[in-house]
Amino acid sequence: MKKNMSRRHFLKMGGLALAAMSVRPSLSFAAFRESETKFVSLRPSIDKRRFVSRAVEVIIKEVKPKIKDEKLRWMFENCFPNTLDTTVRYKMKNDRPDTFIITGDIDAMWLRDSSAQVWPYLPLMKDDRDLQFLIAGLINRQTECILIDPYANAFNDGPLGSYWETDHTQHMVKELHERKWEIDSLCYPIRLAYQYWTLTK
């Protein structure tokens, strides 16, 4: 079905482009295609977003008018808040913030990736206490994960197991998603915790 839709769309666009070129030969297919593109927001509706940061929304409103290129402006609006919109699970656990951030396409949290995903938001914590708690919650969760296994790189949101659990490695417990340690699996959480401390002390 998808192939037919794409073929139909291609034939329609090709036919229209040829017709336009016969009227104005200088009009290229690329220019015709570009004029048809509409850069609309692809963000989830507000009620479907996993976390909403006032500071992030303010930055989007401030920065968008300064980006002249329409496509880059659209990419910024959709990409900058994407971690908060789609990948965050935030709650209070034993009176402390707890944040689990999936990598996006896999329902597991990588120590390195989750650190990098929130890094652009660190300077905004001073203007948004909820955002600060969310990042503190990630540091709490990463610490908990490292204490489960300092040689693992990716973790589940609880003892769920994974398709890697039959790997012939020691300590492949249900909380682990992968046990493929690299030095940045520890460096990124340390870097995040240090930067958080620097900005909030």
Residue ranges and their predicted role:
Residues 2, 40-47, 51, 63-71, ...:
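A short N-terminal beta->alpha junction/helix N-cap motif
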Residues 3, 9-32:
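N-terminal export signals
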Residues 24-61:
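C-terminal segment of N-terminal export signals and the immediately downstream linker at the start
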Residues 34-44, 97-112, 194-197:
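Basic/polar, acidic-poor N-terminal "presequence/leader" segments
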Residues 54-91, 141, 145:
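Amphipathic alpha-helical dimerization/protein-protein interaction segment
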Residues 81-110, 131:
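Internal amphipathic alpha-helical repeat/solenoid segments
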Residues 107-201:
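Aromatic-rich carbohydrate-recognition surfaces in CAZymes
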